[in-house]
Amino acid sequence: MASEKSHKVHPPLHFILFPFMAQGHMIPMIDIARLLAQRGATVTIVTTRYNAGRFENVLSRAMESGLPINIVHVNFPYQEFGLPEGKENIDSYDSMELMVPFFQAVNMLEDPVMKLMEEMKPRPSCIISDLLLPYTSKIARKFSIPKIVFHGTGCFNLLCMHVLRRNLEILKNLKSDKDYFLVPSFPDRVEFTKPQVPVETTASGDWKAFLDEMVEAEYTSYGVIVNTFQELEPAYVKDYTKARAGKVWSIGPVSLCNKAGADKAERGNQAAIDQDECLQWLDSKEDGSVLYVCLGSICNLPLSQLKELGLGLEKSQRSFIWVIRGWEKYNELYEWMMESGFEERIKERGLLIKGWSPQVLILSHPSVGGFLTHCGWNSTLEGITSGIPLITWPLFGDQFCNQKLVVQVLKAGVSAGVEEVMKWGEEEKIGVLVDKEGVKKAVEELMGASDDAKERRRRVKELGESAHKAVEEGGSSHSNITYLLQDIMQQVKSKN
């Protein structure tokens, strides 16, 4: 802590953090809260009671260590919008029908939050809000304080969205959803289909109104915090910073603030496996021999595809950990595993985690040599930070952009071969995109002994080392937190 004290800011700034209610958005925001508090700022996190419970243990340890972090609860108006009680996080829903009322309920938090802000002591200096909570812009305007947007994705994807929003005619002129187009004015030559990019061109009604409000709130914000580091995507950090008139702070990988084993194990939620049991299993395997498989907290693959994934892992003859989140939704998968003998056949070299996994803890273990991921930005960054090459299996959102960065630009992974977006409600119709032979082939390509595989491992190990240097004192991300604190302090002083 001695090195951090030299950077503390006095009098302390007070940051109000608004994480969106989705695991992939909340987890890095909690890490950001700890990073700011370690540098002397007071931090208040505003969320609902149910969501606060997900990171209670991690924050309790942070507070007990003396970090000035507070949590303030607001009531989630589930009844008004016909939502089930206790389902206050987007990963609790598996149908698009409830998404619009969920977002409407989230937007209704504006009034109670406004009242909270009026009573808050010390006076807030700055809001850091998730992109998906545009109402926080009104609050920032009312209290005349800067609002910084947190996206939860990297600069490659942010620049891609920025460029395409200014060239919508490219998307509108495509004759088919299967046609590829070239992203204009981009540092690298990259191509996508229209469904693969997170830029909406056909929204209507309430959903379009929300998206328009979100984009406006983003572009009128004071600046952007990004969970990335300059050495990972230098051209994209540079161009996106230029596009946002300089107010972009790359402060990642924020997951590296989790140094204690307990913090790594409980990051985001209570793990569905005992930490010691997991480590004991990993300790029994050779270095670099285990493939970690996790397709995120909102994985919506159909049963037919999950069976092929399991059979492909079995055929690869590699040791693996397979995480199946939302396990309660997969009774049929469990029946298949038992009746077909799958669980019995793989018990010596396969570990199934049925629920939330201690991902950072697993990825930082020397036995792990590969990561099959849905390419959510947190997972992508956690894999690279741990020096682990990736098999990319994107589902939706920013994940196809992240795949392109990993495979084509960074050359830190191989694609499983998925080209079609997994649309909510149409999973069964889409069916199997990668069969067991395709899974086996991707695992062999990643974990094998070819020159390409060796070069990929060398490259990603180098990126992992750069990530750790970035967050150390004097590193790019550590310095960017200093610049952020100095900037907000100047804003506070100019108003006094």
UniProtKB/Swiss-Prot annotation:
MF annotations from Gene Ontology: glucosyltransferase activity; UDP-glycosyltransferase activity
TM spans (from-to): none
Name of this chain's protein: UDP-glycosyltransferase 73C4
Family classification: Belongs to the UDP-glycosyltransferase family.
Region annotation (Disordered) ranges: 450-475
Compositionally biased spans, kind Basic and acidic residues: 451-472
Organism: Arabidopsis thaliana
Lineage of origin: Eukaryota, Viridiplantae, Streptophyta, Embryophyta, Tracheophyta
InterPro entries: UDP_glucos_trans, UDP_glycos_trans_CS
Record-listed E.C. numbers: 2.4.1.-
Sections of the chain in a coiled coil: none
Keywords associated with the record: Glycosyltransferase, Transferase
Pfam family, one: UDPGT
PANTHER family: GLYCOSYLTRANSFERASE, UDP-GLYCOSYLTRANSFERASE 73C3-RELATED
SUPFAM superfamilies per record: UDP-Glycosyltransferase/glycogen phosphorylase
Residues the entry annotates as binding UDP-alpha-D-glucose: 297, 357-359, 374-382, 396-399
Gene3D superfamilies the record matches: Glycogen Phosphorylase B
